[in-house]
From Swiss-Prot:
Protein name (database record): Pole-localizer protein TmaR
Main location: cytoplasm
Taxonomy of the source species: Bacteria, Pseudomonadati, Pseudomonadota, Gammaproteobacteria, Enterobacterales
Keyword Electron transport: no
Cellular component GO terms, alphabetical: cytosol
Keyword vocabulary terms for this entry: Coiled coil, Cytoplasm
Protein function: Pole-localizer protein involved in the regulation of several cellular processes.
Organism this protein belongs to: Salmonella arizonae (strain ATCC BAA-731 / CDC346-86 / RSK2980)
Coiled-coil segments: 14-41
Length: 111
């Protein structure tokens, strides 16, 4: 009975994909943290604008706050999009890894 060993290139590809999958998972967690942080900043700026009094050069302060809030909201949106893209790539890699494992398992059973 002959056993088919995966080629060296197959093993390297499997390791490369597995490492990429793990790296993507870490990036997802990092981005989720950034999303939370920026959402907190948006809330902070909302609350801050409630405390600004008319005697404090309201137009200038409110303009700055609106600009900062917009920047943070844009960052949150960018992180959400990036997270979705990374999640999709991670799912694709998981499918490839699973298929590679199933092919190896099928090759072993065929013998």
């Amino acid at each position: 009975m002959e056993t088919t060993k995966p080629s060296f290139q197959d093993v390297l590809e499997f390791v490369r994909l597995f490492r990429r999958k793990n790296k993507l998972q870490r990036e997802i967690q990092d981005i989720e943290k950034k999303i939370r942080d920026n959402q907190k900043r948006v809330l902070l700026l909302d609350n801050l604008s409630d405390y600004i009094k008319p005697g404090m050069s309201v137009e200038a302060i409110q303009g700055i706050i609106a600009s900062m809030k917009s920047d943070y909201e844009d960052r949150v949106d960018d992180y959400i999009i990036k997270n979705a893209e990374i999640s999709k790539e991670r799912r694709d890699i998981s499918k490839k890894l699973k298929a590679m494992g199933e092919m190896k398992h099928a090759d072993v059973k065929a013998e």
